[in-house]
Structure formats: C-alpha cells, structure tokens
C-alpha cells in the first residue's frame, strides 16, 4: 500500500505542475483532488493551448494517449488500485467521470447483451447479489470490472403507493428496460429459469425483476443446484438468480466481525463456482455474469460524523436536509423521487442498534460494485 500511496501522491504532485497523460487504474480519477480536471482526450487541452499559448490553468489529467501532446506533457502509468480513503474523500467531485467513463448500473444490461451477442453462449446466467462491493471481490478474477451505482445505493424503492417499483433505482436499474431476458429472448434465448430467496412479501419487486421468467422461490442455494442438476439444456437458456449477499447480514445482526464478513464473501464465490461446476456437465458454452446492487459500510470499521438530520436515514434522505447537512450530500433525482445521499463519512442519523452495516450513500464501499464474468468453454 505504501507504493500505491507514493505513486498516487507523485501523480498529484505532478498534476500541480503540468497536465499529465495518464494510463491509470479506472478508479484512480475518483481519488484525485477536487481541483483536478479529467478529460478523455487532448482536444480540449489543445484548444486551450491555442488560445492561451500556455499550460491549462487547472490541473488536468488526460486519459487517452495523444501524440500531439506526448512531447509536451509527461505520461504516467499507474495501474495499481488507488487509495480507498482518497476515493472516499474525492469521488463526489468526479461524478461526471464516473458516469461517462465507468460502467454504471444503467449500462450493465447493454454490456451483458453486447457480450452475449459477440460470444453466443449456450447458457447465460445472471447472478444478482444483494450487497457486495467491488473491493470484496477484487482478487476473485482478473476481469472483474468496477461498476458505478449512479444513484442512491439501495436495493430498490417503491412509489408512494407501495405498489409501483421505481425502475431507475437499485436492482431495477440493473435489469433494465427492456430487461436482460427480453433482450436475450429476442436473440433466441427462449428458455428461461429464475430463482430467488426473497420472501412472498417481496413479490412486487420479484415480479418486476423476474418478469416473464418462470421463477422459483428457494430456501437455500442447494435447492438451486439440485434443480439445475436435473435439467438437460438442449436450447439456448437464460438463468437469473437472486443471491443474498451482505445486505441481509448488515440488517440482521448487531455486530459483524471481519472474519464473518469475509466468510460470507467466500461463500458467494463458492456458490458461483458450484453453479459453474454443475452447468459445465452440460457440455455447453456457459457464461455467468455477477453484479450487485450496492456494497456495505460496516458500522465498526469507520469513524462516523453524525449530522442528526430530522427524518433522515443513516446514509440518505428523501427530504432536503438543512444547508449545512446538504453540503455533505449528492442529490439524485430518479423516477421522479429526489434522494440526498451522504458523502463519506457522514450519517444523517445514527445507525440502528440492530444493524451492523449501512448503505444508501456515496462511497467506494457502497457505490462501486463488481461486474464479473465467469466462463465454461
């Protein structure tokens, strides 16, 4: 970590003196100081140079190599994961970069469909994990992609009538409209299966996420594996699985040790491997995509600053906080509802005694989730 910190700080120091062409980790721009401007290509910088005959006035990171600028500005390669504390400190200043240059939850369906169109797998699995951060799985597989939750980092929200699912918040924003299944169905994936652990009182959201998919509520993951073993897939098939992640643990126990959290993360990985092992016996080309709705900030692992906003949840509010607290939020408007998500490490209200973790705000842990891909060829 010392080397990473040094490389990050050296880049910050260099940016204070000159624009830099950066071949960097995709999350590094989120860690840079608020004064740093991030541009995709050198065209804007060139136009400034033409106008001013001098270097740009603000620190500038140029993301794409540019032969026109290479002789004038240094190129820095920094592929290591940036310091998490720097991301949490600065990411609210670089939301434009996150929305335009990172995969977002709104882009998952298109990215998945595009990949399937190119690869033409026989069996496609989408595992939706309720509560898992990019940082939790970073060492699982080299191809895991950081995905930005562009909105309140929650599982779903209902309209005031408590019957209508808001389509641009949480899992609904990931499944998309048209849904993953609707898009794959048009590509020939006529056979579909769905599995969820959610209880019947979650039927509204389950019906939304599993629309037109024959879906089974299961008590545990073993039931999914047992059913998959019983099938012989002779046609192109789409399988959608809702897997409990860390969300349930965050809201069901007063305290969670790091060992318990790590054990739950390992169990998710093992379930991915078990699904792949079962489906590999089909002797077909299989791909499993994994994505989460949000990550978790654990209660005992952070030095919180409590703002005591009336009517607020710990990490977000649907009512506008007072001016002082509002300065510590990012405002989203999704499906006609306004959300004020707190930046790190602020809480609108204290974490419930029975909760060991929270989500809903803007942070590396909550707002950067994994989009991972596992193949059987």
Region annotations inferred by a language model:
Residues 1-377:
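Feature captures the catalytic ectodomains and active-site-proximal regions of enzymes
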């Amino acid at each position: 970590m010392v080397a990473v910190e040094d490389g990050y700080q050296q880049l910050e120091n260099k940016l204070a003196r000159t624009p830099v062409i950066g071949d960097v980790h995709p999350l590094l721009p989120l860690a840079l100081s608020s004064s740093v401007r991030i541009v995709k290509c050198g065209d804007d910088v060139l136009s400034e140079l033409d106008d001013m005959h001098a270097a740009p006035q603000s620190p500038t990171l140029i993301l794409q190599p540019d032969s026109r600028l290479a002789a004038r500005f240094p190129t820095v390669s920094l592929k290591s994961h940036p310091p998490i504390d720097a991301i949490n400190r600065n990411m609210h200043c670089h939301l434009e970069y996150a929305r335009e240059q990172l995969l977002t939850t709104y882009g998952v369906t298109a990215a998945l469909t595009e990949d399937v169109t190119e690869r033409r797998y026989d069996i496609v699995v989408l595992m939706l994990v309720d509560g898992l951060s990019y940082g939790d799985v970073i060492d699982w597989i080299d191809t895991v992609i950081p995905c930005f939750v562009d909105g309140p980092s929650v599982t779903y929200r209902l309209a005031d009538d408590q019957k209508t699912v808001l389509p641009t918040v949480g899992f609904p924003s990931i499944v998309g409209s048209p849904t993953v299944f609707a898009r794959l169905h048009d590509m020939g994936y006529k056979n579909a299966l769905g599995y969820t652990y959610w209880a019947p009182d979650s039927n509204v959201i389950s019906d939304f996420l599993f629309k037109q998919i024959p879906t089974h509520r299961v008590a545990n993951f073993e039931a999914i594996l047992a059913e998959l073993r019983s099938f012989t897939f002779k046609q192109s098939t789409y399988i959608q699985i809702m897997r409990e992640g860390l969300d349930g643990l965050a809201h069901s126990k007063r305290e969670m040790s790091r060992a318990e959290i790590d054990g739950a993360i390992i169990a998710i990985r093992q379930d991915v491997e078990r699904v792949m092992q079962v489906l590999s016996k089909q002797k077909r080309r299989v791909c499993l995509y994994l994505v989460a709705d949000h990550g978790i900030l654990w209660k005992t692992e952070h030095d919180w600053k409590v703002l005591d906003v009336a009517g607020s949840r710990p990490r977000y509010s649907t009512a506008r906080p007072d001016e002082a607290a509002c300065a510590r939020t990012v405002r989203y408007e999704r499906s006609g509802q306004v959300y004020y998500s707190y930046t790190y490490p602020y809480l609108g209200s204290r974490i419930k005694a029975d909760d060991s973790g929270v989500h809903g705000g803007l942070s590396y842990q909550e707002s950067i989730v994994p989009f991972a891909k596992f193949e059987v060829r």
